């Protein structure tokens, strides 16, 4: 996590363990086990984002090893654009409002940044009070009903959604997907939303700026700036060619995260590693 850099040297006192761990906790034991396993071996580590790859390079476990990044794939034949009005009818959403979507498995997790979304919506209405009756937020995930009273806009709380077909409808029904996460790697939700042609607003953190091309298919807000996040929401809703951004979002996913693209990158990586092994074998004295 961003608050912990013990992995730069050796893991211990892990903040994810009960009580914050200890100097000789499970994280340290696993670290030492990996250290022994990796010693003397030439390993290529693959992260799913460049950000995570950079973090991995800072780990004592990866010293002298090769780290590269290849993203996770998404089924672009399943997550795809559809008719917005039909999707809204199936979801029970209004046809006469702009809709934002915020979703997380556990919305109350402070790392998901719900407080920043609340503040961004407040700033938005303070600056543009006339949009209050024309804008609503779809909130998806556990604890969504508990948090809906905090938003200053109309809220459609839909709880945790397991049905992927319904998920596609939800992404197609909304105008903008908002992800105010303070820590994230390569969020599947951004990938899914963009695959459905829904532009996204997110903070400049983790792998998010790798996914969203600022002012091309979405908006990357300054980290922890609710004001810039609010500006991003308004920009995508009212100031840009939504159809063009939607098209670019879909194209980004097709070019970067489609299964054949990701598979091709893994094939190229394996071929490169095999060639290196062959070169090493030939260079050994007989």
Model-derived features: positions:
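Conserved donor-binding/catalytic core segment of Leloir-type glycosyltransferases
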Residues: 93-112, 118-122
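Conserved acidic donor-binding segment of nucleotide-sugar-dependent glycosyltransferases
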Residues: 214-215, 219-226, 235-240
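Short alpha-helical donor nucleotide-sugar binding micro-motif in glycosyltransferases
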Residues: 169-174
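Nucleotide-activated donor-binding/catalytic signature segment of Leloir-type glycosyltransferases, i.e.
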Residues: 128-134, 141-165
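Carbohydrate-associated surface elements
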Residues: 51, 73
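Short hydrophobic beta-strand element within catalytic cores of glycosyltransferases
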Residues: 199-202
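Aromatic "clamp/platform" in nucleotide-sugar-dependent glycosyltransferases that forms part
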Residues: 182
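A short, well-ordered alpha-helix in the C-terminal region of glycosyltransferases
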Residues: 228, 241-256, 265-268
């Amino acid at each position: 996590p961003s608050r912990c850099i013990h992995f730069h040297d050796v893991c211990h006192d892990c903040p994810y363990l009960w009580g914050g761990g200890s100097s000789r906790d499970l994280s340290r034991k696993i670290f030492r086990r990996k250290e022994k396993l990796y010693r003397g071996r030439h390993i290529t580590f693959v992260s799913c984002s460049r950000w995570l790859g950079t973090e991995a390079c800072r780990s004592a476990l990866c010293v002298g090893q090769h780290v590269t990044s290849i993203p996770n794939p998404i089924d672009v034949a399943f997550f795809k654009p559809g008719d917005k009005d039909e999707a809204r009818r199936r979801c029970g959403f209004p046809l006469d409002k702009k809709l934002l979507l915020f979703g997380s498995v556990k919305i109350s997790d402070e790392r998901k940044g719900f407080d920043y979304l609340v503040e961004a919506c407040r700033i938005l209405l303070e600056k543009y009070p006339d949009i209050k009756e024309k804008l609503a937020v779809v909130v998806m995930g556990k604890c969504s009903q508990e948090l809906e009273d905090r938003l200053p806009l109309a809220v459609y709380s839909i709880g945790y959604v397991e049905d992927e077909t319904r998920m596609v409808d939800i992404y197609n029904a909304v105008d903008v997907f908002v992800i105010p996460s303070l820590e994230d790697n390569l969020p599947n939700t951004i990938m899914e939303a963009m695959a459905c042609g829904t532009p996204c607003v997110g903070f400049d953190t983790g792998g998010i700026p790798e996914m969203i091309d600022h002012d091309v298919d979405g908006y990357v807000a300054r980290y922890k700036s609710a004001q810039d996040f609010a500006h991003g929401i308004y920009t995508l809703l009212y100031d840009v060619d939504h159809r063009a951004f939607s098209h670019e979002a879909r194209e980004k996913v097709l070019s970067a995260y489609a299964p054949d693209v990701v598979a091709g990158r893994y094939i190229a990586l394996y071929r490169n590693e095999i060639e290196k092994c062959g070169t090493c074998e030939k260079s050994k004295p007989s």
